[in-house]
Amino acid sequence: MRYLILSDIHANGAAFSAVMNSTRRKRWDKAICLGDIVGYAAEVNQTVDRLRAIKPLIVIRGNHDKVCSGVEGDERLAKFSRFARTAAEWTARKLTRANRRYLSTLPKGPKMVDGAFAIAHGSPLDEDAYIFSDLDALRVFRSTDFPICFIGHSHFPVVFSWDGSEVQMQIATPPEFRLQLDPNKRYLINPGSVGQPRDRCPLSSFATYNSETRLLRIHRVRYDIAATQASIMSAGLPAPLAERLSVGR
């Protein structure tokens, strides 16, 4: 089966549109979203509505989805950065009742998909924890048994592989990263962020994966950054949330 893997859209409507438009040239059978549909940018309900319209679709929750929908409150919100907190509070006010309910009922990862791979927002051991390094990945590999897990949260496109003795880290460099997955290795794969890339490349990032051929691709797509920046500023959200999009940080 051919999968479209999205993560960390963060209410960036222009980026989401660019990604979905680009996938018209890439055949896929099922879409996966690794969470953080909202937060940071201003196209809140438009983004949730568009995601919900995709069929077939499997979605798990992210930390921003939890906070903005009220699943987690002030204690979790206090751990956000100042700008993220401001955006989360604004987002919570803007969500429609239907979309707030939708976000609040999203399942927690890790979750198996078609017996082919697992999905999680952050670490499979803790949905709010980041996987940045080979040591972070090693802890997960030693504590789990899935062959492949797609993760998000860090906004950094990267592949960690483990052959049972050593973890290798491969940064997914633009414009397209391709990897034939080895059946004798295990993988943690981050497709990067649709809406707020942080690898110093402003291009929107997502993945496609063919479970039959075991071919992984991480794609980069240009989008109208200025349009997203304008909507963020027009909403009265913090300027750094707009400015960072130009540099992919």
Residue ranges and their predicted role:
Residues 2-100, 104:
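Core catalytic region of metal-dependent phosphoesterases/phosphodiesterases
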Residues 70-72, 130, 160-163, 229-231:
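Short, well-ordered secondary-structure micro-motifs
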Residues 2-10, 116-123, 188-192:
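Active-site-proximal beta-strand elements of phosphoester/diester hydrolases
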Residues 5, 59, 149, 188-190, ...:
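Conserved beta-strand scaffold positions in the cores of enzyme catalytic domains, especially
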Residues 164-249:
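Acidic, His/Gly-rich catalytic cores of divalent-metal-dependent hydrolytic chemistry
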Residues 10-15, 39-41, 64-69, 111-112, ...:
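Active-site environment of divalent metal-dependent phosphoester hydrolases
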Residues 26-27, 93-162, 249:
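His/acidic metal-ligating clusters that form di-metal
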Residues 52-54, 141-143, 181-182, 209:
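Short, conserved loop/helix-junction motifs that constitute active-site signature segments
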